[in-house]
């Protein structure tokens, strides 16, 4: 399958790296092009080789021509997207079948421009919504609702957010195992990202968001909890939450405080999640019973790393429905691996 990556930033590069680590590059997937603001293949090779958080890429890297990037012997054309809309990109000429839309800009119906340019499908590496009913965007969380994918109908799909990918599998287990969720509040303690400031700067819409990322804990908004309702409709209206952006470069954690529909216990909840991690959520949910911290989940490929030692039950007498669970995630690497998994899934449905 011929693939293009539009946007060669954090997620775009890590998706390519994940393909290489999974030994899919040049075999199951022919990444024919990457699009960014330049075609400087030498610089792209440098960015892939040296990563301040994820470490050095294991594949060989070179630039045999100014606009040709070579990764592990696989040649990729570098396309300059400066000033171009998705509909103006050379997908027809390059024979592109699937575009991974990783710019963060076209997370709506505008991503249909890739189809106009000749691609057959689009995966958006961000939460996405369409305001045009004739151009729907289907949200898929691997391990949770990929069975809803319809190849004939869903030409553009969203991989949701990294936080939704962490939270939704945990919620899915509680629903599938029968304890249910009556209501819940989620907090994500989230590493800073490229949208934040290195020093205090202008942020007219979000004053706190303009403060220096590396020296502050910054309250922020997130739609991740509400988005769970898109992939698990029975939770719609039951979950909401907020974020705290913290001074770590990657490695985040979700804290879900919730009330179950049926009485249960910490031991039972842990058992449910352990069972799921070994069966229907294998490869998506990891069960951990060790004393880990955020640095320990860097470069962990799972969507959600459940921390069984952190599970709490309200200590009121006879209270058997009020709990807190905690699950970690590498908001970069885990998410990028799910983009690749979604691509694999879609390729099998052609």
Curated annotation (Swiss-Prot):
Domain of life: Bacteria
Location of the protein in the cell: Cytoplasm
Family matches, as SMART domains: Gp_dh_N
EC annotation from Swiss-Prot or TrEMBL: 1.2.1.12
Active site, renumbered: 162 (nucleophile)
Binding site for NAD(+): 10-11, 36, 82, 125, 331
Residues in the signal sequence: none
Primary enzyme class: oxidoreductase
Any single biological process term in GO: glycolytic process
Annotated site residues (Activates thiol group during catalysis) in this chain: 190
Keywords: Cytoplasm, Glycolysis, NAD, Nucleotide-binding, Oxidoreductase
Catalytic activity: D-glyceraldehyde 3-phosphate + phosphate + NAD(+) = (2R)-3-phospho-glyceroyl phosphate + NADH + H(+)
GO cellular component labels: cytosol
GO terms of molecular function: glyceraldehyde-3-phosphate dehydrogenase (NAD+) (phosphorylating) activity; NAD binding; NADP binding
Pfam families: Gp_dh_C, Gp_dh_N
SUPFAM superfamilies recorded: Glyceraldehyde-3-phosphate dehydrogenase-like, C-terminal domain, NAD(P)-binding Rossmann-fold domains
Pathway of action: Carbohydrate degradation; glycolysis; pyruvate from D-glyceraldehyde 3-phosphate: step 1/5
Record-listed D-glyceraldehyde 3-phosphate binding positions: 161-163, 193, 222-223, 245
Subunit structure: Homotetramer.
Described function: Catalyzes the oxidative phosphorylation of glyceraldehyde 3-phosphate (G3P) to 1,3-bisphosphoglycerate (BPG) using the cofactor NAD. The first reaction step involves the formation of a hemiacetal intermediate between G3P and a cysteine residue, and this hemiacetal intermediate is then oxidized to a thioester, with concomitant reduction of NAD to NADH. The reduced NADH is then exchanged with the second NAD, and the thioester is attacked by a nucleophilic inorganic phosphate to produce BPG.
Sequence similarity: Belongs to the glyceraldehyde-3-phosphate dehydrogenase family.
Protein name in the entry: Glyceraldehyde-3-phosphate dehydrogenase
The organism of origin for this protein: Treponema pallidum (strain Nichols)
Annotated gene: gap
């Amino acid at each position: 399958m011929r693939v293009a990556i539009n946007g060669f930033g954090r997620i775009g590069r890590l998706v390519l790296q994940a393909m290489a680590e999974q030994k899919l590059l040049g075999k199951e997937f022919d990444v024919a092009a990457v699009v960014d603001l330049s075609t400087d293949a030498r610089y792209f090779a440098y960015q892939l080789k040296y990563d301040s958080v994820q470490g050095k890429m294991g594949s060989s890297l070179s630039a045999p021509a100014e606009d040709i990037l070579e990764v592990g012997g696989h040649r990729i054309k570098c396309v300059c997207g400066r000033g171009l809309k998705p509909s103006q990109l050379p997908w027809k000429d390059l024979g592109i079948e699937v575009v991974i839309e990783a710019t963060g800009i076209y997370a709506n119906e505008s991503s249909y421009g890739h189809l106009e340019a000749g691609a057959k499908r689009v995966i958006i590496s961000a939460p996405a919504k369409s305001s045009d009913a004739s151009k729907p965007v289907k949200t898929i969380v691997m391990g949770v609702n990929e069975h809803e994918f319809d190849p004939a109908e869903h030409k553009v799909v969203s991989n949701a957010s990294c936080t939704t990918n962490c939270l939704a599998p945990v919620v899915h287990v509680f629903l599938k195992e029968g304890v249910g969720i009556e209501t819940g509040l989620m907090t994500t303690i989230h590493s800073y990202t490229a949208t934040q400031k290195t020093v205090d700067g202008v942020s007219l819409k979000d004053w706190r968001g303009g403060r220096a990322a590396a020296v502050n804990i910054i309250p922020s908004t997130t739609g991740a909890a509400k988005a769970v309702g898109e992939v698990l409709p029975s939770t719609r209206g039951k979950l909401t939450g907020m974020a705290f952006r913290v001074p770590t470069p990657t490695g985040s954690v979700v804290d879900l405080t919730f009330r179950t529909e049926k009485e249960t216990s910490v031991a039972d909840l842990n058992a449910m999640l352990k069972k799921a991690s070994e069966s229907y959520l294998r490869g998506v949910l990891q069960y951990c019973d060790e004393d880990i911290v955020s640095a320990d989940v860097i470069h962990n490929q799972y969507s959600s790393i459940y921390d069984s030692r952190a599970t709490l039950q309200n200590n009121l007498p006879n209270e058997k429905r009020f709990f807190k669970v905690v699950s970690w995630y590498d908001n970069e690497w885990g998410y990028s691996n799910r983009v690749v998994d979604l691509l694999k899934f879609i390729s099998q449905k052609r």
